[in-house]
Structure formats: C-alpha cells, structure tokens
Amino acid sequence: MEPKYWNINLEEMMEAGVHSGHQARKWNPKMAPYIFAERKGIHIINLTRTARFSSEACDSVANVASEGKQFSMVGTKYQAADLTASAAIKARCHYVNKKWLGGMLTNWSTMEKRLQKLRDLENKEKTGGFDRLPEKEAAISKGQLAKLKKYLGGIEYMASLPDVVTIVDQREESIAIKECITLNIPTICLVDTDCDPDLADIPIPANDDARASIRWISDKLASAICEGRKSYMKD
C-alpha cells in the first residue's frame, strides 16, 4: 500500500496525555532522542517524534495487513487489558490481555496442543458433553475450560505464529519481547521514557500508563490494520 495520512493530530495526543512520561530519575537514557523536556521531575515526550513513529507504524501494519498476514496484540496490565482486546477485535487480530505465558511463541508446538484442548472443551460444552459426565469430572473440565479461555481465548484460532506483534508497555511484557526477538518476529512497541526503544522494530514513544494514551495508539494501529485488510479483500 502507498503511505497514507493517518489523521495523527498533536492536539489529540496532548489531550490523551500521550506526552506525559515517567519520573526523570527512572528514565532509560536510550529514550533521550524522544524526550522534549523535564517538568517538575517528569519527562515530557516529544510528540513530533511520536507522530512520526505512529505514522511509520500505521504504514507498516497496513502494508502487512494488505498481504493477508496476521497480528497479535499484547497488553496485559489492567490499564491496557480491555483496550487491547477491543482494538484487536476491531481489527480482527489475535490478542493476549491477561497474562503472557512463557513459551507462547517459542514453544509453539505445546501451545498448539493447548489451543486444540481449548477448542475441544468448548465444543464439548456447546454440544452438552459436560452434562453427560460424572459431576466431579464435569467440574474439572469446566475449570480447565475457564482457565484456558481466560489466558488463551484471544489466540484461540491462531493457526501459526503471528507476522507482527504489537505491545503495550515493553517492560511489563519483557518475556513477549524476548520471544519475538528470538523468533525474529517484528514488534511495534508503545515505549515510555523508562523503556529501551532498541528492543522494538518500531518504537512509538508514548505514555504507557494512561488509558487515553493507550487507547489513542491502539485505535490508530487497529484502524490502519483495517485499511490494509480492505485492500487485501479487494485483491
């Protein structure tokens, strides 16, 4: 796809608090190029850099989506969990929003078996299979299903490793980042002033704690993916 204008508005970013970083004493020096100033002990993110990298990220995901490739969105902390799920559902992406289980990507063969178990249990529940089990066995199966749905429900139908992973809060999702790096899966990360931008293929400098900031970034990426999918469907 040709690069597009993604309606990235500095005033909207200000209103969403995208510019508000962490306490200066907690910063990662690698974020220096993305910091505009320090105010009352808080680092202020340079929104022109945020706009540039947001646009680059949107172009990237739109291109990937236009080729019919798959995404996984990751955001498990409480501020991001429901926003991650809603953005992923909007863009028809897989997502992880409860807890990143070690080996989700690097131990994919085992994860595939867990996902098949989830689908089997779900099918058994829908067809009344639990009702035909002894009470204790039914309770165990229902417990297994609830646990699997909680942690794996967002990737239930992920048939292979994702082509791109988007991540909210790089520090919180350090295991996910490491697995992506190990497998050479490109990442787009929302990075606050305490993060290492070098770990992401496309870092988007932004407040990773405020819900409005997370929503703003997630919505832009989801919209760009949707645009890319439209192009793929036309072809």
Curated annotation (Swiss-Prot):
Q: Which GO terms describe its molecular function?
A: structural constituent of ribosome
- What's in the keyword line of the UniProt record? Chloroplast, Plastid, Ribonucleoprotein, Ribosomal protein
* Top-level taxon in the UniProt lineage: Eukaryota
Keyword Flavoprotein in the entry? The reply is no
Question: Subcellular location, in the record's words?
Answer: Plastid, Chloroplast
Cellular compartments per GO CC: chloroplast; mitochondrial small ribosomal subunit
Matching CDD domains: RPS2
One Pfam assignment: Ribosomal_S2
Q: Name one GO biological process term.
A: translation
Instruction: Quote the HAMAP family the UniProt record gives.
Output: Ribosomal_uS2_B
Q: Give the UniProt family note.
A: Belongs to the universal ribosomal protein uS2 family.
Q: Which PANTHER family match?
A: 30S RIBOSOMAL PROTEIN S2 PROKARYOTIC AND ORGANELLAR, SMALL RIBOSOMAL SUBUNIT PROTEIN US2M
Classification via NCBIfam families: rpsB_bact
User: What is the official name of this protein in its record?
Assistant: Small ribosomal subunit protein uS2c
The organism of origin for this protein: Huperzia lucidula (Shining clubmoss)
Q: Which gene encodes it?
A: rps2
